[in-house]
A protein has these predicted regions:
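Mixed-charge (Asp/Glu-Lys/Arg
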Residues: 1-26, 31-128
């Protein structure tokens, strides 16, 4: 939850309107009004160098895990304090795992005040 709160705060500072999906099984955590379209965002956090990107589901006694698919979300926001990584789906090198060292160019320093005023432009199908 801490990662989600950090992302919400950052998006608020960038003046992005946002909503949380009513369906807890949705493949994204936030719906954000981007520059031209609504953008879906998946939020993760980790203290590991690499972690598996999986959707978790199931009931009280069982857990199921599924790999994310194209169309599940537009951007992946990954928190590893004091950094946040903002990666468009099309720029993910693998849909099943995330390795921080592979995404240094997508890293933003949460201890740098410029991070909160230099808005990242969120667009569908963003090309780098």
């Amino acid at each position: 939850m801490a990662g989600e709160e950090l992302v919400r705060y950052l998006l608020h500072m960038w003046n992005y309107p946002m909503c949380v999906p009513l369906d807890p099984s949705a493949p994204f955590d936030l719906l954000v009004k981007g520059e031209n379209d609504w953008i879906t965002i998946q939020i993760k956090h980790s203290i590991q160098k690499t972690f598996k990107l999986k959707r978790e589901g199931g009931g009280k006694n069982t857990r199921t895990y599924k790999t994310y698919q194209k169309g599940d979300f537009d951007y992946l926001f990954v928190c590893q304090f004091p950094y946040i990584y903002i990666v468009p789906w099309d720029h993910l090198k693998a849909a099943s795992c995330f390795t921080f060292s592979m995404y240094e160019s997508y890293r933003h320093d949460l201890t740098d005040e410029k991070t909160y005023v230099n808005k990242v432009i969120l667009e569908k199908g963003r090309k780098r």
